Design a protein with these regions (language model features):
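Glycine-rich beta-strand-centered segment in the early N-terminal region that forms part
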Residues: 21-39, 46-82, 89
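NAD(P)H dinucleotide-binding glycine-rich loop of Rossmann-like/cofactor-binding domains
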Residues: 45, 58-64, 75-139
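Short, glycine/polar-rich helix-capping loops at beta-to-alpha or helix-loop-helix junctions
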Residues: 83-85, 162-170, 234-239
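Mid-domain Rossmann-like dinucleotide-binding core that forms the NAD(H)/NADP(H) cofactor-binding site
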Residues: 108-184
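Glycine-rich phosphate-binding loop and adjacent beta-alpha segment
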Residues: 155, 209-279, 312-315
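Short amphipathic alpha-helix with an adjacent loop that forms part of the alpha/beta core around
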Residues: 186-196
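Short SAM/SAH-binding signature in class I
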Residues: 199-203, 222
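C-terminal capping/lid region of NAD(P)-dependent oxidoreductase domains
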Residues: 272, 279-284, 294-315
C-alpha cells in the first residue's frame, strides 16, 4: 500500500510517500480501505515530535479516517497514528458507522473537529443559554463548527476571530454576530467593544499573545478553554489574577475525551445527526492527494486554509 512515512522528525519536508506491506489484522481487528484522512494541527506537531504524546519512528502520521470495511460498510475512526495511508488495521469496536446523508468529506470533518467543538462547549465550558462566546480561528475546522454549535445551544452574542476578509465573511455566514480581525492589535479591547463588555466563554487555540489578550476579556465566572497552541508559544497563567477576577482557564486534549466512550458516542451522535439533518455545515478547505500531504501541512501551519483539510489516499 501507499503511505506517508517519516523516518526522522521534522517539518513537512520530512514526509515521504512510500510503498509498504499491507497491514494484517490482529484479533478483533479489521482492515479499512481509507477514502479520506483528516489533516490536523496535531499531525504537524507529531512529525516534529513536539506533540503532547511522544512519537516513535518510523511514523505514519494521521489520527482520523473514513473508509470501507471488507463487508462494504462505511465507517469512521480515530487512531493514535497511521491514517495517512491507503489501508489501516484497527479494532472493530472502535469504528463508528456513518449515517446516510453524511458523505465521506463531512464525516472526517466531524470526527476530531466535531467532537472537539461539541465537547469544549458542553463538557469544558458548560455553555449556558444566553452566554456570550468568542471563538478564535473561527473559520477553521473546529472553529467553524463551534460557531454553529454555540448558536444552536442558545448562546447570546457569538463573536468569531479570523485573519482575512474572506474568512470573516464565512464566519458571519455560519451565524456569528460579529467577526473580528484576529491579527490586528488591541484584540482584547476590540472583543470587549464588540460584545458590549466582558465575555462569558472564550475558545482559544493559538496561544501566545492571543491567549493573554483573550483571557483578559473574561467576565467574572467566565471560562476560557484552550484546545491548541498553533503558535507553539506557551503561556504562564497567574493564579492570583484568576482568583481576583473569578475567571477559569480550562485545558482540553481530545485524548482524554476518547477515553470516555459514552462522551464520544453522544458527541458523534449529535454532530453526525445535525449534519445529516442539514443543521450543521462542514467547511472543507481542500482535498489533497496522499502525495500532497506536505502541501496540506504547509497550508495549515501557514494559516492559508479555511475549514477542514483532507487527504484522498486513492489519488
Amino acid at each position: 500500500m501507499k503511505a506517508i512515512q517519516i523516518t526522522e522528525f521534522g517539518g513537512p519536508e520530512a514526509m515521504e510517500l512510500v510503498e509498504l506491506e499491507d497491514p494484517q489484522p490482529g484479533p478483533g481487528e479489521t482492515v479499512v480501505e481509507i477514502t479520506r484522512s483528516g489533516v490536523n494541527f496535531a499531525d504537524t506537531h507529531a512529525t516534529r515530535n513536539e506533540y503532547l504524546a511522544a512519537q516513535e519512528l518510523p511514523l505514519i502520521p494521521g489520527v482520523e479516517f473514513v473508509g470501507r470495511t471488507p463487508e462494504g460498510k462505511r465507517v469512521a475512526g480515530v487512531v493514535p497514528s497511521g491514517a495517512y495511508a491507503e489501508r489501516i488495521a484497527v479494532p472493530v469496536a472502535g469504528l463508528v458507522p456513518i449515517p446516510d446523508g453524511v458523505d465521506d468529506d463531512q464525516a472526517v470533518a466531524l470526527l476530531i473537529q466535531g467532537l472537539t467543538a461539541d465537547a469544549i462547549l458542553r463538557v469544558s465550558a458548560h455553555l449556558a443559554v444566553g452566554e456570550s462566546v468568542v471563538v478564535n480561528a473561527a473559520a477553521g475546522g473546529t472553529g467553524s463548527l463551534a460557531v454553529q454549535i454555540a448558536r444552536a445551544m442558545g448562546a447570546g452574542r457569538v463573536i468569531g476571530l479570523a485573519s482575512s476578509d474572506e474568512k470573516r465573511s464565512l464566519v458571519l455566514e455560519l451565524g456569528a454576530d460579529d467577526a473580528l480581525d484576529s491579527a490586528a492589535t488591541g484584540l482584547g479591547d476590540r472583543v470587549r467593544e464588540a460584545n458590549g463588555g466582558e465575555v462569558d466563554v472564550v475558545l482559544e487555540m493559538a496561544g501566545g499573545d492571543a491567549f493573554d489578550e483573550l483571557a483578559s476579556t473574561l467576565a467574572p465566572f467566565g471560562r476560557m478553554v484552550t484546545f491548541g497552541i498553533a503558535t507553539r508559544q506557551e503561556n504562564t497563567v497567574r493564579t492570583g489574577s484568576l482568583m481576583k477576577h473569578s475567571r477559569a482557564i480550562v485545558g482540553f486534549w481530545i485524548t482524554h475525551l476518547l477515553a470516555r466512550p459514552e462522551l464520544v458516542r453522544a458527541g458523534l451522535e449529535r454532530v453526525m445527526g445535525a449534519a445529516a439533518a442539514g443543521e450543521l455545515r462542514t467547511v472543507i478547505g481542500g482535498v489533497y492527494p496522499l502525495s500532497g500531504a506536505a502541501q496540506a501541512h504547509q497550508a495549515l501551519v501557514g494559516r492559508n486554509s479555511t475549514g477542514k483539510l483532507l487527504l484522498d489516499p486513492s489519488s
